[in-house]
Amino acid sequence: LDAMLVKVTGKTINQLFAEEGEATFRDRESAQLARLEGSRKTVLSTGGGVVLREQNRSLLHALGYVVNLTATVDELTRRLACAKDRPLLSGETALDERIRQLLVERDPFYADADIRIDTTAKTLEDVVAEILDFYDGKRAGVL
């Protein structure tokens, strides 16, 4: 979803946050997500803040299964230590503390996912296999 916003606006996520603020970014994010309504057979990767709005959570569920990929704070800190495109992770607060704060704030919304997968110490193949097992179980009516 972020990549779609960058393409549509011609600006990076950092530029959008700096020039317009988080509220306007979230408005743009919601509008872009709404454009996908009715889409089928689509895999959509969103930023972690998309779930902050009820309308977005509802639309995500209408589009299909919602998969929440998570990891421990230590693992997320390691993965994001060099990230330059995460405006909410920059600033004075230590990265691990900021990640912890965001997870606490957002966890109730992440819990709304159809499946949550802890990706800590898992390979990409392991995670994909878990998602496919979930999907196959849903299609077979097992889950």
State each model region's role.
Residues 2-61, 85-87, 109:
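ATP-dependent small-molecule kinase phosphotransfer cores
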Residues 39, 104-143:
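NTP-dependent small-molecule kinase module
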Residues 55-58, 78-81, 129-130:
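Short amphipathic alpha-helical segments
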Residues 48-50, 72-74, 122:
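Short glycine-rich anion-binding loops that position phosphate/pyrophosphate groups of nucleotides
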Residues 15, 62-108:
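A glycine- and Lys/Arg-enriched "phosphate-lid" helix/loop adjacent to the NTP-binding pocket
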Residues 31-32, 55-56, 98, 105, ...:
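Short acidic active-site motifs
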